């Protein structure tokens, strides 16, 4: 992993919402992120941890461009990031087959003929270790682990280099979690990916991530390598999170 090449830079970002949500422009402004600065290095998995309501999801939406920062910059050094969602039950359209779901981004955004789309879909299915029979299945016919593999394949089908994974294993049992974490790490190595991995589960973060970003009340209060954060935390808040996970 290179420490010099970056996948993403977030510089002094302050961001939030108007009352009524993301799209409403009227009403008082509610600041959620406060002067957030960090980098995601090319090829690394950066964990993002913090209690519910600390701004993790707002940060993800700001990076994706769904929420516009009031100040600061989000600088992408690769293609626009794609998202792996927490809940594969709701993120996959139940009306369509896996093949249709995987082909749809290529139909909309790519310049590929039918044969090229079919080949890329099958290649991606192999990458996420699913049998070809899954192509004809609807999401409801798959297990939770298989659905999450389809979600990962959907995020990767346009060949991005940076993924935001928002609690991607929290809905899975422990055995399947371990398999998905291994898959994510293998895909990182094989495809030279970078991840921002959002999780409330510090044990999962410890297993998967290279560095960790700790957020409290919309601010980054600590960041460092996994060993630095888990073995030598500096902030009381980080120590509290670690103690609660024991």
Summary of predicted features, one role per range:
Residues 49-51:
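The feature captures the beta-strand-to-loop junction immediately N-terminal to the Walker
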Residues 64:
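Helix-to-loop junction immediately C-terminal to a conserved catalytic motif
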Residues 116-133, 242:
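Conserved ABC ATPase "signature" region
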Residues 138-142, 146:
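Conserved ABC ATPase signature
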Residues 157-161:
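A short, proline-enriched helix->beta-strand linker immediately N-terminal to the Walker B motif
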Residues 205-207:
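A short, surface-exposed alpha-helical micro-motif characterized by mixed small hydrophobic
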